[in-house]
């Protein structure tokens, strides 16, 4: 009863704080001059992190097992993992471009988990025999940590594509305008002016965007490399556990199949980084596709409730 009450309090604290943080982010998005609100948002993230940590510890103590047995608990753990990623650049005292991805990801994940849509899974239950294994914590935690990491890396790659698409769109629209200008007005003068411009140093906004995309690309590669390693460990742990539980290392279960597809997509991404012709926009496109694949693997298969991993949001125990 004590743990249930504590979990209830911590859940409401995290949800209330997340609601405030979302409001602050919307205000700072619309009114950039209110920079002081950003500090309040960061403090709200810290409160949410400690609330989530307290919830996980309380859930662990009350149930007797690490809280990863259903979709609700896994979403809570996923938001906790996203916050860990959020703090890494701060520890390194580096420019925190990663926070532009991790902050909204943490907010949305935690907000969905505590919104009331998964209320039937809030009550802690005893693990079914299939999940009563020491491999539960190792396998599921590695998979969720890899999902959190790969999602952040994929979103960073998507941000690169958006920035480059906007630059290309601006370039072609400007080029079209220049062609019309040269055709109808001051053609000789404009040609000389363009020649001078071509030999000058790139403008500051373009140079800033170039630096930004390079930083995002570097962060994306490092984050995805870490996530790919965690995913590989998680899949290997799952294979060992599957052999103990079902007598086979691999069964081509829907979850296993999509985990393999996810692994393949990011293996292609990492391989493309070694090829100069594919490095940049092409590799970022592969990683962006991986973002959708991860959500299908993690969320979509659970909701369908099919296969050996059928622990979706509408069922408390595997079939």
Swiss-Prot record:
Any one GO cellular component localisation term in the record: plasma membrane
TM segment ranges: 9-29, 44-64, 68-88, 143-163, 223-243, 257-271, 286-306
InterPro entries per the UniProt record, alphabetical: Cyt_c_assembly, Cyt_c_biogenesis_CcsA, Cyt_c_biogenesis_CcsA/CcmC
Keyword Amino-acid biosynthesis part of the UniProt annotation: no
Keyword list, A-Z: Chloroplast, Cytochrome c-type biogenesis, Membrane, Plastid, Thylakoid, Transmembrane, Transmembrane helix
GO MF annotation: an example: heme binding
Pfam families reported for this sequence: Cytochrom_C_asm
GO biological process terms on file: cytochrome complex assembly
Places the protein is found: Plastid, Chloroplast thylakoid membrane
Domain of life: Eukaryota
The UniProt record lists the keyword Nuclease: no
Topology of the protein relative to the lipid bilayer: Multi-pass membrane protein
Binding partners and assembly: May interact with Ccs1.
Family to which the UniProt record says this protein belongs: Belongs to the CcmF/CycK/Ccl1/NrfE/CcsA family.
Function field: Required during biogenesis of c-type cytochromes (cytochrome c6 and cytochrome f) at the step of heme attachment.
UniProt xrefs under PANTHER family: CYTOCHROME B_B6 PROTEIN-RELATED, HEME EXPORTER PROTEIN C
Protein name: Cytochrome c biogenesis protein CcsA
Organism of origin: Agrostis stolonifera (Creeping bentgrass)
Lineage: Eukaryota, Viridiplantae, Streptophyta, Embryophyta, Tracheophyta
């Amino acid at each position: 009863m004590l743990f249930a009450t504590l979990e209830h309090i911590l859940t409401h604290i995290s949800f209330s704080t997340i609601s405030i943080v979302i409001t602050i982010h919307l205000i700072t998005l619309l009114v950039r001059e209110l920079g002081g609100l950003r500090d309040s948002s960061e403090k709200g993230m810290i409160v949410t992190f400690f609330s989530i940590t307290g919830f996980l510890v309380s859930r662990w103590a009350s149930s007797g097992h690490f809280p990863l047995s259903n979709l609700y608990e896994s979403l809570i753990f996923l938001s906790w993992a996203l916050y860990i990623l959020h703090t890494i650049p701060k520890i390194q005292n580096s420019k925190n471009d990663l926070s532009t991805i991790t902050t909204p990801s943490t907010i949305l994940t935690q907000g969905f988990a505590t919104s009331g849509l998964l209320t039937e899974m809030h009550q802690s239950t005893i693990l079914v025999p299939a999940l009563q294994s020491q491999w539960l914590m190792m396998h599921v935690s590695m998979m969720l940590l890899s999902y959190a990491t790969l999602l952040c890396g994929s979103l960073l790659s998507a941000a690169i594509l958006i920035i480059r698409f906007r630059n290309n769109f601006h370039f072609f629209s400007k080029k079209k305008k220049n062609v019309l200008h040269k055709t109808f007005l001051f053609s000789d003068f404009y040609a000389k002016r363009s020649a001078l411009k071509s030999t000058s140093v790139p403008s500051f906004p373009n140079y800033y965007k170039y630096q930004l995309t390079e930083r995002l690309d570097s962060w994306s590669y490092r984050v995805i490399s870490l996530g790919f390693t965690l995913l590989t460990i998680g899949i290997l742990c799952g294979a060992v556990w599957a052999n103990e539980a079902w007598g086979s290392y691999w069964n081509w279960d829907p979850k296993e199949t999509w985990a393999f597809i996810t692994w393949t997509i990011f293996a292609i991404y990492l391989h493309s980084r070694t090829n100069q012709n594919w490095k940049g926009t092409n590799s970022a496109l592969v990683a962006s596709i991986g973002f959708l694949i991860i959500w299908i693997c993690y969320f979509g298969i659970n909701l369908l409730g099919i296969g050996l991993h059928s622990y979706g949001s509408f069922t408390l125990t595997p079939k």
